[in-house]
């Protein structure tokens, strides 16, 4: 994520999505900027988050980042779909999204984690090859809380480091359940 600027510099773009109540967007010529310098400044996220990236593994063992999602947690957020969530925009190959209330999201802002939370991942466009999830948890740790990634195809559950990064490698093969969009989900449990 980047710090927001009131200006849209040449060569940049953005996506706008109207909420059900409707909205309008007007870009005035005065919003153009001829200034130079750094366009985007990385910003730290003010809320606990779970970021999940997926990397494709090439035959030569090199990797490419294919897609990713972000989930922010706060008592101020709702688990319902609202204008704080970002819809998934599809690309031409692998697509990773969160499926929440039958809506596919790239960014979801959810209420603070409870012991029974489940994040349903939606993974499409995969190829017959190996992949690696990078699951980055920041400020999620609470005594007794554990996280895991479930693989419905292999019927496995891999523990997540809820105070750091976890890497999980998996392979897609020529079996329908192996490339099912609903193969993976992230869950939490507490004591």
Predicted regions and their residues:
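Compositionally biased Ser/Thr/Gly- and acidic/asparagine-rich
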Residues: 1-191
């Amino acid at each position: 994520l980047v710090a927001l600027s009131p200006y849209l510099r040449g060569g940049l773009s953005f996506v706008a999505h109207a909420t059900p109540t409707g909205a309008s967007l007007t870009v005035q010529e005065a919003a153009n900027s001829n200034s130079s310098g750094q366009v985007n400044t990385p910003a730290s996220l003010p809320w606990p988050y779970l970021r999940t990236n997926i990397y494709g593994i090439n035959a030569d063992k090199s990797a490419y980042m294919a897609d990713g999602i972000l989930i922010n947690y706060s008592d101020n957020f709702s688990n319902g779909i609202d204008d704080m969530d970002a819809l998934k925009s599809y690309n031409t190959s692998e697509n990773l999204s969160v499926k929440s209330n039958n809506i596919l999201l790239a960014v979801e802002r959810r209420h603070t984690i409870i012991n029974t939370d489940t994040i349903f991942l939606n993974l499409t466009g995969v190829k017959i090859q190996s992949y690696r999830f990078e699951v980055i948890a920041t400020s999620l740790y609470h005594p007794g809380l554990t996280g895991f990634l479930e693989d419905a195809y292999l019927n496995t559950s891999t523990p997540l480091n809820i105070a750091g990064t976890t890497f999980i490698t998996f392979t897609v093969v020529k079996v329908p359940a192996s490339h099912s969009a609903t193969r993976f989900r992230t869950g939490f449990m507490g004591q």
